[in-house]
């Protein structure tokens, strides 16, 4: 790599003749030709066209001189991991067949490589490759007979799409494909198969400060990306610092769209899956500690920006990242239809799934029709989920979970110690927030769904004994580990939210310890003490007695609630102060789409009356218990919650929910 700053401009055009030199007069034909030589300060301008290649940047930029790859026309340059497959012949009925010589795949054949690994709970029967008809990712079958039948998958979110099937087998040095195109002639349609594993991703660590702007990035044969493994995607920085991925459309990944994930550690890569003898949770702890040894530091990894991207139709995650996403920002993105086929299943599926989201900001995104919206697992210390619109992150009515599938919700914070802040969001799915964690602040949200996994979802019972799940917490605003602790539960703050029971209560799903709890409100926090009740146990005016206090060292932590509004029977915590409880009116809140823009249709703001509260700030929220860190900005400065969903000023006092006033709630949400 070179830090030499050159400020060259290279041009690329898929329609160019071969042998170009990157000049405007003689552009390169392939983006990777420019990626092999671009140095700090250089810009690569790519003409509209389809680029069937893997782009592997060789050199890093610098903080003041990034290497910029730019589509000349926004979304005009399409980089794809797929190739067109022609020459289909009729097999029988709607079934066609085609053959591909395996030489095209090199050392990685997606049609012999299975989706599998740590935390993968579905059967290991799907390949990393995929077949597409007119940009629709078809559904893989386990047998040819299933492909021939062409029946809808009862678990798929889209029943009609699930009738488009494909099946593969090997015959010598050829991959044989069968496909049910439901009456379409594949020789008259655009039929492609994914060939390349990645689209735009370095093959080594430390290729820092790259900007990728305005591309369509699509159709890669990506692999399952669990947290204690190398995590790939269609595009990603591969364990580096300072990437910007902006104004891109990222879609049709077999597994993950954008990866901000973990490097390859040969001694801890799918350890549980390949060696069996240690638990995957233990290997996650090892991944954190080994990461410290391998340079997981603020100065070397993370601080990426993902902005204004359209991420959709990926089958594991839209955006994934273990440890490599620290100090990053994901903003103004539209993320939807993730893990909808239900062909893949496991504990790593969501619109955004991050482990160790230290000081990560997720803001102003629209996330919908995903198996989950945002899932922050382990070490979401300093993470902030703010000003997002989330809805329909649940299985459609009548769809059952496939084998290995996860539950659904808008925001899931798992086994973290905080401080994690969820503020100024619109959360309209059936289950809004799942928190088998501690140190969570839920502030100024509109919440139409339930809380779930309260005082649950953390430890396992193995050999008739409790096996606590110890997870790390960190030096404030750093990656260095400060300690490990199990989850005591509690230490939560719930202020100035609007709760409404939007969906009917399911009498069989009224358990707040369940991920499918159907009861909206805060009564589920009754099991935790108030601060006054909790602190009294420690007898602060007496000499400490280690034995006597041990009970409370491992007991529940306190909770704080105030200023919330409750509608349609949403229940209320006994510790709540200054609540508005409306038992007379019926509140409504729905997202409405008009001409591609999204609005909120609600009567709530006419029901709030004169109910107001004071402005919150970091000092009022206090510090999360284990890391002893405030709910504050990544730079350590205080947050004053005087701005709403749109950054409108709230004034000297505030109403609950994400909007400063009724008029603000009428504006375009996204």
Please give the residue ranges for each predicted region.
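Bacterial Sec-dependent signal peptides at the C-terminal "C-region" and cleavage site
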Residues: 1-5
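Beta-rich catalytic cores
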Residues: 231, 315, 348
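A conserved amphipathic helix/loop scaffold
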Residues: 458, 474
